Amino acid sequence: MASPRTVSVAETIDEYLARADWRVNANANQGYSLGGMILNAAGKLIANYWLDEVYAPEAGTAHREGDLHIHDLDVFAGYCAGWSLRMVLEQGFNGVPGKIASAPPKHFSSALGQLVNFLGTLQNEWAGAQAFSSFDTYLAPFVRLDALTYPQVRQAMQEFVFNLNVPSRWGTQTPFTNLTFDWVCPDDLADQHPLIGGEVQPFTYGDLADEMALINRAFIDVLTEGDQDGRAFTFPIPTYNITKDFDWHGPHTDALFAMTAKYGLPYFQNFVNSDLDPHMIRSMCCRLQLDLTELLKRGNGLFGSAEQTGSIGVVTINCARIGFVHSADEDAALARLDELLEIARDSLVAKRATIARHHDGGLFPYTQRYLGTIDNHFSTIGVNGINEYVRNLTRGADDITTEAGMALAARLLDHVRARMVEFQEETGHLFNLEATPAEGTTYRFAKEDIARLPGIRHAGTDDNPYYTNSSQLPVGYTADPFLAMALQEPLQQKYTGGTVLHLYMGEAMPSAEACRELVRRSLSRFRLPYITVTPTFSICPAHGYRSGHHEQCPDCGAACEVWTRVMGYFRPIESFNIGKKGEAQERTYFSTATPGDPGDSSGSGDSTDSGDSVREEAPWHGSPQPVS
């Protein structure tokens, strides 16, 4: 069918050149550049193709009017993917006709080089994050075979990290990459023998603890040093699996938490005190039959995916608008939610069919080579502005921090989960519920609603409006991280896609020990799937790294870049979109001197303490237990 819509060539180019469209800065990873202009212009054509030629009219209308947001419309591809690192290392980077073929690597440096090429190439066949799991476990055999010293491992790792941060992706973007580190060899790999260069090795992965430690230490040291100006490396985003046998006081743990205290780069995946299963990272590619009556977890957080799985596409629901339009009528609100969920389902089914058809037709040659099928990829539905949903539904009487407000939020999330089970049974596809990062969507929804619905409650100002992400707390609510965790614990557990609680700090943590204790206590006392520690820091052109928010260098007065996390990854605040800048201005930072801090008399307990005293030190409005 022919589309009646046209895209003005002159307006498209002129808007970009003049930076007249807020979407020029919607993505903090994409700077103003020729490549950005090409992507922006092409993206408008592709977006209109999706909306007019692929999706049903009601989906196009719902997106254009801001009832929901269909992500990545500017890219004719799936969303994110986790790859089998073991497959790449055992088979090499090859298999696409007419393209250069690399045999399986035999050495550490060549293995890292192939991984850079792999991630950069596959990024061009997907819209979002590309991920590898068990990075330290699978690369350890190469360190053993090459008999590498620490300086040699560090040099190779430095080259790897710098190469991954080159803006080589379309749109002059850096490839969006995630690496998950085991730290301790997983039980299901411990007795397996690596295959290197086509030869089975006499040792097992479980024999390589020393080599894993070298890899982890080298990677951490490279990230801690930063680039030549002291900037943090935005990618790869490291995720660390914290299991019950994690050595909190091991020889390299201080370095891990010193890096976290300074730059806050890692995600910590909670295998200590959550319903996450360490083996799920490798299980999806082996499950021939999936139980569609249960909601599976994708694994590895917002920007990581377990091996051979990921997400075909993401649709986020504008919950704030639902609350306003159906004020004081929860039943009507949930009925409207159902309508939007069904539109989201149908659009994701249409996208999966389209991507699968062109996958089989060769449009994504490297994905076809290394993935084979997209059957194990999820269809992802997210929520945005649940705090504003509560505020509008209750006409300002409650928000997500009150007991009644949390109950409303929990019922909404449970309702979505129940519908997703139905969707799985109806379609035969995997669905998951994600706390979508919604970097630009939070602003787009609020901007649209202010224009259409006078009086709607939102965060920020009318000039810099936004909605609170997913079911997160208002950004200015509290400086107590333990209070925030207690309030978020029951809601964060309801997500089966990515979710994370970012502990935003106004400056670096005072020490590696303080950072370690914060992470240890957080993961042992709360059933949160993922957390980050997110300090704010500044970069002076002359003096480099400076802890805290400094628009001018305290030493020389030069203008500084101020860096913090924008929904998952670190970028300068100046590169944020309008809504995210408004959010950053309103944020209350968590205190670096928290209850149970090592400097506090309560900080001497071990990891088996109950943590009840910590929860009780800051009174709050709701119950920390899950709301049924």
Regions found by a protein language model. Give the residues of each.
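Conserved catalytic cores of very large enzyme subunits
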Residues: A2-D375, G396, T402-D555, A559-V562
